[in-house]
From Swiss-Prot:
Enzyme Commission no: 2.1.1.191
Family membership noted in the UniProt record: Belongs to the methyltransferase superfamily. RlmI family.
Cystine bridges: none
Protein name from the UniProt record: Ribosomal RNA large subunit methyltransferase I
Length: 395
């Protein structure tokens, strides 16, 4: 007999809408031997089968659903089908844009809760962030090898959220030879990706379309790229004809890579300045110096990691947008982003509006932006929508 979870009366509604999470408070009882990451069957209080998922007793989300099909086993074939489907759904995008770097698996949105997989040329980088994903590591690697027999596979599960699942952080080679760096190309721009030490899996693929959109406004402008990481917004801007690009970050490694990205794209490095400085303080310093820019990119790290921190995050977003608006030349373009899934788009837009009031500037929103299409959002899992951005004209 399989292990099973029975829900409290009425708590099956989200599963009937095929949402993949079951919180601890929804569980009435469990039956059978259930270890971390084990596959369990989920039943309603009325004993109706609802789904099959991974058990995680240490997490608030105690079951993450693998499948809503009762006769589908969670075996090698299951992961092979999911990965093949995800690759097929991205083929048109890959071919249309000539991508060599893309997100292959976007966790719950691709039917694999807790699994993030990015492809960088001939290297695959995966993050296994849930108990179920960790439990099925060998099956996932087997499926990846079947789909990509020539690729190296590297695990970057060095993420604090694993501790909530009762798991340790880990990085390791899973297959093949893994170089420290890989070069990918998107929209004609080459990008150095450090798969072993870079942020996340090495790079922010979700901003691909937004980099191209921001670059459309860069010609003949002086661009300030805040939280620049490896400088790709800046490389795009230079390629589009920017007069100058000033890149700010607090990582020497990121700034050095940003310089190298300029060089490998054969762009004019004399137009570039790379500064290791806290962005908030740098913006205040520019204001004190009466220095202005005609395009500013604000792509900060996640400010919101819990609902309790949302108000504090709003203050941070407002302050940084206000400071940017205060040093913007008339008619300048602000590209501002939030990668915090807990920040609603309407609230983010309100925060930017409040920043404009405090800055004493008239501001127009001319585009609303989101994550690239290889980061899809399942209609059953709206939490998959996290990246939001605004292109604003500061009058």
């Amino acid at each position: 007999m399989s292990s099973r979870v029975t829900l409290h009366p009425g708590r099956e509604k989200s599963l009937l809408r095929r949402h993949p999470w079951i919180f601890a408070s929804a569980i009435e009882s469990t039956k059978g031997r259930m270890n971390l990451g084990d596959t369990v069957d989920v039943y309603s209080h009325e004993d109706v089968w609802l789904g099959r998922g991974a058990y995680s007793p240490h997490s608030q989300i105690q079951v993450r659903i693998w499948t809503f099909t009762q006769n589908e086993s969670v075996d090698n074939g299951f992961f092979q089908r999911r990965i093949a489907r995800a690759q097929q759904s991205r083929e048109e995008l890959i071919e249309r844009h000539g991508l060599t770097g893309y997100r292959l698996i976007a966790a719950e949105s691709d039917g694999l809760p807790g699994v993030t997989i990015d492809v960088y040329a001939n290297v695959i980088v995966c993050q296994l962030l849930s108990a179920g994903a960790d439990k099925h590591r060998e099956k996932i690697v087997w499926a990846l090898k079947a789909q990509f027999p020539e690729h190296g596979i590297y695990e970057r599960s060095d993420v604090a959220v694993r501790k909530k699942e009762g798991l340790e952080e880990i990085t390791q080679v899973l297959a093949g030879d893994i170089p420290d760096e890989v070069i990918i190309e998107e929209n004609g721009v080459k990008i150095i990706v450090n798969v072993k030490q870079g942020h996340k899996t090495g790079f922010y693929l979700d901003q691909r379309d937004n980099r191209a959109i921001a670059a459309q406004y860069a010609k003949d402008r002086d661009v300030l790229n805040c939280f620049c990481y490896t400088g790709t917004f800046g490389s795009y801007a230079l390629a589009a004809g920017a007069c100058s690009v000033t890149s700010l970050d607090v990582s020497d490694l990121a700034l050095e890579t940003a310089k190298r990205n300029v060089d490998i794209n054969q762009l004019d490095s004399s137009k570039c300045e790379f500064i290791n400085h806290d962005v908030f303080q740098a913006l205040r310093d520019y204001k004190a110096q009466s220095k202005q820019f005609s395009q500013i990119i604000l792509d900060p790290p996640k400010f919101v990691d819990s609902k309790a921190s949302l108000n504090r995050a709003c203050r941070g977003y407002k302050d940084i947008n206000m400071l940017a608006m205060q040093i913007m030349a008339p008619g300048g373009i602000l590209a501002t982003f939030s990668c915090s899934g807990l920040m609603p788009f309407d609230l983010f837009q309100k925060v930017v509006a409040d920043a404009a009031l405090d800055a004493g500037r008239e501001v127009q929103i001319i585009q609303r932006l989101s994550q690239a299409p290889d980061h899809p959002v399942s209609t059953n899992y709206p939490e998959g929508f996290y990246l939001k951005g605004l292109i604003c004209k500061v009058l």
